[in-house]
Amino acid sequence: FMWSLGNEAGDGTAFTAMKQAALALDDTRQFHYEGDFDLTKSDVISRMYPTADVMEKLGKKEPITISLYDNIANQLAADSKPITAEMYEGKPVLLCEYAHSMENSLGNFADYMADFEKYDNMCGGFIWDFVDQALHRKAQDGTDLWLYGTDFEKEEPRHWYSLPNTTAITGSNTYFCANGIIGADRTVHPQYYEVQKVYAPVQTLAVNPDSGSFTVKNKMLFTNINALECRWQIEVGGRLLMHGKLEPIDCPPLSEVTVSLPYTMDQVTGLTVSFATTRALPGLASGFTFAWDQFVLRPMPQPVAEKDGGDLHYDHRGNRVEVQGADFDLTIQNGRVVSWVIDGSQRLVAPLEPAYFRALTDNDIDFLNFVPPLIKFHPLYGWRRAQRRTHALRTVVQAGADNTVEVHIAMSTPRLREDLITYKIYPNGRLYVYHSAVPKQDMLRFGFQMTLPGSYEYVNWYGRGPHPSYRDRKTGAALGRYQSTVTALEHRYMRPQESSNRTDTYDLYLCDSHGEGFRVQAYYETPFAFSAYHYTTMGLDKAAHIHEIPYDPSLTTLNIDGAQCGVGGDLPGQGAVRAPYRVTAGEKCSYAFILEPMHKKK
């Protein structure tokens, strides 16, 4: 427990007087104040929202200077103070606010924990924040409304002297009140599970997985690990092969031990080690999974296209190719699969086509969060236009091995160069899809999208889950075999945005109640990400509230992504996605997957 002298209130002699008054009441506690520029009042070096380079300087106790931008920001709300090498003496580093969890956010959270554990002078930090703020109302038809800012300010005057972060144009911070790891209705956001995993007080590390040797680290201050039950299980593609429990592990607080797990590795395997409570504790039920870690002991098996002796026929005219098999007809036009008739039934509501846009997250919107009327002019909408304007320059068709037909297409797409698509059609109806390109600007996503019948509601996948994950927020999403519905895949934030992605997927089924649908398989060792929902991406992006999402029961949108930009979270309401998690300009993107039609069960 520490004394706090307040928050974001500037600096001055009043804080010295406050400290003296507090010491007179209790002189046994340390003091915290982030706005202390000369560090005469605070017993810790307190920072808000440090970026990766600032974290490294803080950990290495290096001087920190501030820029002109920092000086300007300091006049508004920030406290980005300079730090000299001498100031580190006897003062640990504490992040009084970090990991800004503004709706679909909290990216690279695990990277912060890695820094906390790497540097001895790091105390940790406080996530901003715990719960969204919104007002609940019921519409006349009973629909739940979660309202914010401008929903209540139609009569309020707009003042010319309002600060930018109170938005003179709108009179409020609008949805900037949605920063929690749980929702205003106390439903859990996906980032909650990321926090739960990253903050887990027990960690298992591989020593020699081939022989079953692992190190268990106890990060708890007062509890021996023998109070928990250690469980392990081995799976192949989500199918359980072996499982067991260890005898209680004697590992005192802040220590580590080596354990041996009694498994064999004759097949492609993945291992999960977990620790669970053995009795009910305050706030925790007996059997609650306290901590877990996963290890890929062997790579996933690769899909093998079944050889089929059937014949394919095709007709090629310009940028249009029609392919006929025994029970299907597939048409490619202008780089898109525009028709796919299987067993006499059209499977596509809208084409299988390249996709580069996502419904903008709060962090994607960046500084325009402070000026909402200008969001529609955001440069990232250029990717939406690029997606609409992509077209084929040249289409080449050739007969491939095993009676296949290969279609190679050179595409022209704004913001991309060297844009190439290959479709390979097998006699049994399977479709191999390959796409490569080099972005001229950082991308939101590099993938394909197809619109299927709304009856395609049932989902089964092997990948990370069960909740949504992104390339910079997937530590807390375990690899496994999951099943759900398209409706349940959706996660709702207060302001609708990209939200339902599942990363590191190797195998996906999307079917109706009769088993008709599609299977998607990763090709070689590169998994894909997917999302599915009963509305369009553009409709999601236009909605300002949950109740405004234009649900359409007649369609299911399926996204199959080779890459998607992370969600970020280093800075409040700003992109700041770290370099490893971007889809970076100038770096070639490529991926492949296999689409297989699933027929109705007989």
Spans of features found by a protein language model:
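Short beta-turn/strand-loop junction motif enriched in small, turn-promoting residues
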Residues: 100, 112-113, 219-221, 412, ...
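Beta-sheet entry/capping signal
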Residues: 2, 29-32, 44, 92-93, ...
